[in-house]
Amino acid sequence: RLHMDPCWTNDPTKKAENEADISAFSMARYRLYLQKLYIPLIKDAIAHGLYVIVRPPGVCPGDISVGDKYNRYLKAIWKAFAADEYIQQNSGIISIELANEPVRVHLSDGSNSDKALHDYFQPVVDEIRAQGFKGIIWVPGAGYQSQYQDYAKHPITDSEDNFSYAVHVYSGWYGNMTDKNCNHNTFIRNFKSQVPMVETKPIMVTEIDWSPEDPDKA
């Protein structure tokens, strides 16, 4: 999993508050370092026999809305990435994770709806396919990539039928697990409830940790 780190894509003359702040983002720098850094890193990983999942620079702001500045940012990032000749030639090995850890996703007017996730990410999928990229697209959910129920009602559609969902798995998100209270069946039941498409589609876990609370007991 390659993070196109914003320390390269941000204009050094501008100050970004955190990785969710895209005010310092420079498309010119992104295009430059896509060629000078990110694609060479991808090539090196492939030379080592790895498949590469690429995520965009930074993380989602806590609240995002359909058609907002961050939505346009994701479309611009992936439009440039998906149009690249090398990326297209290696689309069987390189896949795209649309965003990192959306938290709360709203309609364009800021209201809540079970259509918001679909309406936010469907246009990003469409933008990628419009460039001719045919590789796998991994779609994130809400709640830091732990909530996917809304996609069961409003699923993503894909002209290539070559997409699924990227999920983050931290034990507390699927049943408040602790060292003293960890039940595999509870975890599995909650995971199936929160990520219902796990029953019908291959799921990619792009972050996972189950470290003991007391590291001396590891």
State where each predicted segment sits:
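Extracellular glycoside hydrolase catalytic/binding regions
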Residues: S65-S95, A99-A218
